[in-house]
Amino acid sequence: MASGRDPREPLPGWLEIWDLDREPWDEWLQDMLRDLNEEARRHFGMNMLIRVWNYCVEEGRRHNTPWNEIGYKYYRIVQKSMFVHFRCGCRRRGPFSPYEERRNGQGGGAPPPPPGLA
């Protein structure tokens, strides 16, 4: 280095990394949350997703966290849950139903209604 300059790009500062007020980030996060929630509803159900969201909001309020970071925390938790869920071998493709028949560890809940009443 004859010029004395460091040819490497300098690391961005903390504020540059977490500047969550930029428009593209907001749009990306909203789109990803919409897609992730649509898929997560098929596997976990609304009750669990609402509990996770409430947890993230409570933590965010406790620490005065901006809404974008709260949404991103929710996104990370649900995305990791989906990864583990699929990694454990989920084969579900239909909508989540907490009351479907459970046989040999598959499905969950009460038996299906009798034929003709379904």
Curated annotation (Swiss-Prot):
Database matches in InterPro entries: Lentiviral_Vpx_assoc_factor, RetroV_VpR/X
Region named Disordered: 98-118
Location in the cell: Virion; Host nucleus
A biological process term (GO) from this entry: viral life cycle
Principal cellular location given in the protein's record: virion
Pfam families (alphabetical): VPR
Keywords: Host nucleus, Host-virus interaction, Inhibition of host innate immune response by virus, Viral immunoevasion, Virion
The keyword Ribosomal protein is assigned to this record: no
GO cellular component: host cell nucleus; virion component
Keyword Acetylation assigned: no
Note: This is an African green monkey isolate.
Task performed by this protein: Plays a role in nuclear translocation of the viral pre-integration complex (PIC), thus is required for the virus to infect non-dividing cells. Targets specific host proteins for degradation by the 26S proteasome. Acts by associating with the cellular CUL4A-DDB1 E3 ligase complex through direct interaction with host VPRPB/DCAF-1. This change in the E3 ligase substrate specificity results in the degradation of host SAMHD1. In turn, SAMHD1 depletion allows viral replication in host myeloid cells by preventing SAMHD1-mediated hydrolysis of intracellular dNTPs necessary for reverse transcription.
Subunit structure: Interacts with the P6 region of unprocessed GAG. Interacts with host VPRBP/DCAF1, leading to change substrate specificity of the CUL4A-DDB1 E3 ligase complex.
Family of this protein: Belongs to the lentivirus VPX protein family.
Name of the protein in question: Protein Vpx
